[in-house]
Amino acid sequence: MPARNRWMLLLPLLASAAYAEETPREPDLRSRPEFRLHEAEAKPIDREKVPGQVREKGKVLQIDGETLLKNPELLSRAMYSAVVSNNIAGIRVILPIYLQQAQQDKMLALYAQGILAQADGRVKEAISHYRELIAAQPDAPAVRMRLAAALFENRQNEAAADQFDRLKAENLPPQLMEQVELYRKALRERDAWKVNGGFSVTREHNINQAPKRQQYGKWTFPKQVDGTAVNYRLGAEKKWSLKNGWYTTAGGDVSGRVYPGNKKFNDMTAGVSGGIGFADRRKDAGLAVFHERRTYGNDAYSYTNGARLYFNRWQTPKWQTLSSAEWGRLKNTRRARSDNTHLQISNSLVFYRNARQYWMGGLDFYRERNPADRGDNFNRYGLRFAWGQEWGGSGLSSLLRLGAAKRHYEKPGFFSGFKGERRRDKELNTSLSLWHRALYFKGITPRLTLSHRETRSNDVFNEYEKNRAFVEFNKTF
């Protein structure tokens, strides 16, 4: 590829930079451009019969593949024109014909293959083509810019940073240099500390989860206690990018609730975690280990050590799967006979209908085992559903959550034992959150949430209902 042509190839990048956003932000996954590449994919075509377009003396000529093959100079001009103008549809038609030509510019063909692969979402293939080009022509800034962007898209952060650093040393046009700086800033933000926090004031019914019945035969149960709680949450996490999409993470968080009038129900959990993972444009997988400590009633209650596996993948631009498995061992500092281990497996499927609506369904399995007291052993089978909606131009948004589950215990409960039955619980959880984008303060939008939780059981002591209403405030730094 002649040197003049290598710089001419910057023209489509320069044009796109003029209309680019101020910064290549880390958008919400459901609106991320790289997951929409196949939505406008051209229909299968017979490339030998579809005409190409060549501009000659201000006119656009319609020429079929056979004619182009008989005119190598015209075919080369058509190929070069499609690449320089970043005409994906034109490259898709002309490239197969161009590759049949004996006399061809191998570098131009390789560059066109890279552009087409990237447009079709085959980013790894595009990176391979661009690397081959850079190896042959290290001073091709247009190719290096596309390589850097493809590496960024595929979340190979360390390699992308290296390429953008090299581009910074080039004498690029100001608009492209600005884009390079924005990409470098976005890469730094990917690996920066992320701090998030929130709090809410809750009016809560049945804090102590007392049974629905006050009396059962000769037994009298505790009365239900209502109260106001202050819920809080604060967390921080950092990611360190390694080579080829690998990364390590570390973080910590603390969350809990305080009941000003009922301090014996105060509950707090604090934990730290660290792990390693791999991510590219479609998937994110990793393993993390964690340590958590819980206090209840302002006194130490338990601590847990465990590990968590996760695998998230975009199956299509609109469908995403989220899977995780967690194992942990809990030590109860108040009652050694309550030590246990747990296993949790969760799978979710999310459908993003558009930027304003999404649906989610999930299946959960949770198992808890206590070697010292089999009466605490149970399996829980859960089903989850969520619907998020932004209501047109009104500014109002909502999130509806529904959940149902069954708990199967290994042994009878105290009261179910009188009936000769193992304990069986049925759970129902519902919540509705509402917020309006016009209501915010310093980037924080308050969210009103109403929730209801109900447990039905063949053991009367474990039947209860719980209602909560609260306004929550969340912020990510």
Where are the language model's segments positioned?
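Membrane-embedded glycan transfer/ligation machinery
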Residues: M107
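Gram-negative bacterial Sec-dependent N-terminal signal peptides
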Residues: M1-E22
